[in-house]
């Protein structure tokens, strides 16, 4: 590992994920296990990279843009693996792994620049910043999952509602066909339940993360009142998820409307992250 | 020794005529009574026409599967058909309702029926069980024999091959199955779901049964006449199934809607039982939990507008029917491959059956050779045990090749004259064998030859298994 840069390391799990999809596309049942094994191998390698790098560089090593993107991919993968284990919904793994792979590729191309936080934050604030990043990323990963699940929900709900392209019985018996052609396992109740779980776990994390962000902003700019675009988008996102959670708990909102809420919320997250990290770093409030 | 099938099905007769036949052979007692009459049919020489018999009766067909006596010829087959037709129908021309298949065509027909190629819904699995029942009943009434045993086992084997080697049964096509599969697209687990069945139709019953099979524990049945609903439950469901069912007043079903997840509607009502305005408040009370409505009644009993309500999914019989249509197409495509398998199996069966024609000749030939050897060897060997051993050994060695050729000749129709030539050459007369005092367990020899011919030594044990 020491002969490779961090960016090159990200390509190892990336290529494993891409390679694994070749086995899935072969549409042979015996190759499905190879696909699953490769996905888990990719995840284990991702985890090894994370822990070894953490051991070598410490937490300050995490304060680079590429590392944050890599970390985000790792968190998404943990969430996906856990959901796959709990809900036995193979389509989650099939749909989300490409997003993880894209994240790893972005990590490779992202600037390998460390953000010097020592000069601007105290030790305590550095810990707060790290926690802020971790919480926001875990929350965002859960919302990313909710976003994909919501898309599947809307797609599947439409098929059931209009009664078209709904294959009930075509037993091709391969997960690729089951997922993409038959929508096997896509029952609306489970999709809605998973969406709700993502919201229930993700919302408190995002809330704490945003609160920490506001605290850090105050610490950095010595005022709560300086309104930056990232804060507006973050608060708007938070508000959408807060309304969604409230409606779900108090009024029993579920189904298509809940899915639409999740999609809108995540699109706002994507826009805030893209703006803050890739397009305009100053958008976040710092250079 | 000919196989004869006479019967009527949905293809040859309408439901009214099928009902007439079905009613007269509805119970095992009625069938046994009719079977006795058939087995007592005699030819002009007062010899029984039918050796073995099985009666197959399902909702779509009634068939009489027979193995005729060796002396029965084509004329007798028509006589049997006329007798069957006259037994069930008084009207003239009723024999046109019945079809008749002989030998290869009969075997092919039975194998097609067993493989569900001749069913109203191609590929449906029930028919094989019904054929097994018919065979078991034939065994029970002791009307079966070597030929029908082989014929039925070959039919079971053929049906199994068709199901495993083609996709004929891979796409289920029943409304009840489709309803359950659709439910699985909406709900994660059916075990905790509540189902409301409105009406007591046949389709509703089948669907309710299918839901119970898939783990549903709570089914409420409401009918305008509560007594009829109670009677329906009593008549239609088994003990375990009844534990999952509650009969409620029809006036109370609306109160149950907010707690129900699936509604199955199969009433005979001419108007809508569930309207758009009825469901709107229910959905609010349900806190937007999905509601699946299945309307299998004609005319429809659920307002189609209801499908526009969010989290409500309404499927009527046409919607489900369209999904099944695709599967029927798949099955029809597979039927071609399946027919080839049926034909191959029917040919194999006929080869085996034809080989039986050689058995009496083989037995006579063996006896003849043994007799000659016994007379000649008795002059030189006194000890019986040693003599018998030598006689058997020599008979086997002398006749091994001729017997192989005789068996081949029996199967091959182009060499049909060989058996006759053989009889003439060795002066073999079927009628005089026993009169000449041969008591050598001819039946045992015949059985051994048959087993060799069929290549199926486990035939008897298989019969026991099925019994």
What are these regions, as identified by a protein language model?
Chain A
Residues 116-129:
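Interhelical loops and loop-helix junctions of multi-pass membrane transporters/channels
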Residues 3-116, 136-155, 168-181, 191-216, ...:
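Hydrophobic cores of alpha-helical transmembrane segments in multi-pass integral membrane proteins
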Residues 54-55, 121-123, 218-219:
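Short hydrophobic "helix-edge" motifs at membrane interfaces and signal-peptide entry regions
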Residues 155-165, 219-224, 284:
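Membrane-interfacial segments
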């Amino acid at each position: 590992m020491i002969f490779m840069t961090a960016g090159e390391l990200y390509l190892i799990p990336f290529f494993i994920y891409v390679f694994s999809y070749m086995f899935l596309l072969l549409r042979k049942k015996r190759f499905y296990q190879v696909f699953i094994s490769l996905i888990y191998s990719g995840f284990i390698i991702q985890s090894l990279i994370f822990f070894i790098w953490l051991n070598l560089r410490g937490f300050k090593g995490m304060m680079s843009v590429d590392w944050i993107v890599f970390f985000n991919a790792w968190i998404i993968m943990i969430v996906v693996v856990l959901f796959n284990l709990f809900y036995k919904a193979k389509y989650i793994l099939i749909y989300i792994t490409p997003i993880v792979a894209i994240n790893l590729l972005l990590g490779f191309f992202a600037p390998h620049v460390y953000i010097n936080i020592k000069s601007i934050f105290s030790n305590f604030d550095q810990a707060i910043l790290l926690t802020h990043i971790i919480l926001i990323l875990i929350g965002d990963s859960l919302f990313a999952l909710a976003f994909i699940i919501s898309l599947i929900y809307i797609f599947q709900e439409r098929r059931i509602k209009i009664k078209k392209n709904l294959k009930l019985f075509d037993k091709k018996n391969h997960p690729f066909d089951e997922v993409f052609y038959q929508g096997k396992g896509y029952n609306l109740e489970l999709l809605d339940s998973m969406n709700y779980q993502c919201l229930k776990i993700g919302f408190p994390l995002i809330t704490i993360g945003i609160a920490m962000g506001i605290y850090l902003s105050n610490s950095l700019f010595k005022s709560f009142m300086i309104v930056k675009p990232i804060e507006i988008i973050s608060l708007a996102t938070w508000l959408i998820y807060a309304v969604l959670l409230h409606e779900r708990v108090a009024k029993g909102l579920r189904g298509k409307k809940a899915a639409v809420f999740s999609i809108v919320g995540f699109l706002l997250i994507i826009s805030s992250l893209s703006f803050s990290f890739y397009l305009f770093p100053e958008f976040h409030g710092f250079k | 020794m000919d196989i004869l099938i006479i019967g009527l099905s949905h293809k040859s007769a309408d439901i009214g005529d099928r009902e007439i036949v079905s009613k007269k052979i509805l119970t095992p007692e009625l069938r046994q009574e009719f079977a006795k009459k058939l087995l007592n049919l005699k030819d002009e020489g007062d010899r029984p026409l039918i050796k073995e018999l099985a009666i197959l009766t399902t909702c779509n067909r009634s068939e009489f599967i027979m193995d005729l006596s060796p002396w029965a010829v084509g004329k007798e087959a028509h006589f049997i058909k006329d007798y069957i037709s006259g037994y069930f129908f008084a009207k003239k021309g009723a024999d046109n309702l019945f079809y008749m298949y002989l030998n290869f065509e009969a075997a092919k027909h039975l194998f097609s029926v067993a493989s569900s190629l001749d069913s109203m819904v191609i590929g449906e699995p029930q028919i094989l069980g019904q054929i097994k029942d018919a065979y078991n009943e034939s065994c029970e009434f002791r009307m079966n024999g070597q030929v029908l045993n082989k014929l039925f086992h070959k039919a079971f084997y053929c049906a199994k091959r068709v199901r495993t080697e083609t996709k004929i049964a891979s796409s289920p096509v029943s409304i009840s199955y489709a309803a359950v599969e659709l439910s699985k697209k909406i709900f994660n687990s059916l075990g905790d779901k509540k189902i409301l069945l409105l009406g007591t139709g046949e389709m509703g019953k089948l669907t309710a049964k299918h839901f119970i099979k898939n783990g549903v524990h709570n089914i409420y049945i409401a009918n305008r006449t509560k007594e009829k609903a109670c009677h329906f439950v009593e008549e239609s469901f088994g003990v375990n199934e009844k534990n999952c069912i509650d009969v409620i007043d029809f006036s109370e079903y609306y109160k149950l809607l907010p707690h129900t997840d699936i509604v199955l509607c199969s009433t005979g009502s001419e108007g809508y039982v569930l309207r758009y305005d009825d469901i709107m408040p229910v959905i609010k009370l349900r806190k937007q939990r999905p509601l699946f409505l299945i309307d299998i009644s004609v005319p429809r009993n659920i307002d189609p507008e209801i499908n526009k309500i969010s989290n409500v999914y309404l499927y009527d019989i046409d919607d489900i029917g369209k999904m099944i249509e695709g599967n029927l197409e798949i099955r029809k495509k597979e039927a071609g491959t399946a027919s080839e398998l049926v034909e191959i199996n029917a040919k194999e069966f006929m080869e085996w059956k034809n080989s039986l024609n050689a058995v009496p000749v083989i037995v006579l030939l063996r006896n003849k050779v043994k007799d000659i050897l016994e007379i000649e060897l008795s002059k030189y060997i006194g000890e019986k045990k040693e003599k018998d051993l030598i006689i058997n050994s020599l008979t086997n060695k002398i006749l091994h090749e001729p017997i192989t050729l005789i068996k081949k000749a029996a199967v091959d129709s182009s060499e049909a004259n060989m058996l006759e030539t053989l009889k003439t050459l060795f002066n073999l007369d079927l009628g005089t064998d026993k009169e000449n005092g041969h008591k050598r367990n001819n039946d045992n020899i015949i059985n051994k030859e048959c087993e060799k011919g069929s290549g199926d030594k486990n035939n008897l044990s298989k019969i026991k298994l099925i019994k």
